[in-house]
Amino acid sequence: MIFRVTYWELPGKERHLQFLKNYCLGAAVAIVLFDTTKASSLEKAENILKSIENCDIPIKYLVCNKMDLLTTKKNITNPASQQDADTIAKNYNCEYFNCNSTAINFVNPIYTSMTENIIKLIGTNLELRNLIGKNISVGKKLFNHPNFLQSLKDSQYFKD
């Protein structure tokens, strides 16, 4: 069985949001990141989630990035509220993860969850007819990412 993986990474600037729906239509997964050191970043993440709300994306993640900087950076004046992030994740039916900008082991659970949720969406009977209409598409960049490949190996659906 071969899966086509399409991965789009879009900048969070306002001028790029007008194209967001074009990329999200037909997507199986959306991962929206925000910078925990900036409350404005969480606000932008919420705007992105609002923008894609009608795109019928079955699997969504809200990821809080740069958790390590909260303890190492001294001049953070307006960090994002974890309570607000939890509320936003619940309001938009997102799984919520905290991520560290320097440690790879914080990213692995996101890839593992994404892979397992995609596989659940497809179902365990991996036939072409089960993929039709499920919007399963992952791009080369993500498919070749070591964390994504490891999550495939770690997934309960692909164990020997």
Model-derived segments and their meaning:
Residues 13-17, 42, 79-82, 104:
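Structural motif corresponding to alpha-helix initiation and N-cap regions
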Residues 2-17:
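Switch II (G3) loop of P-loop NTPases
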Residues 27-46, 68-76:
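Conserved Switch II/interswitch segment of TRAFAC-class P-loop GTPases
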Residues 1-2, 57-62, 66-160:
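Conserved P-loop small GTPase signature centered on TRAFAC-class small GTPases
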Residues 33-61, 113:
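Amphipathic helical hotspot of TIR/SEFIR-family domains
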Residues 11, 37, 102:
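Adenine-nucleotide cofactor-binding loop residues
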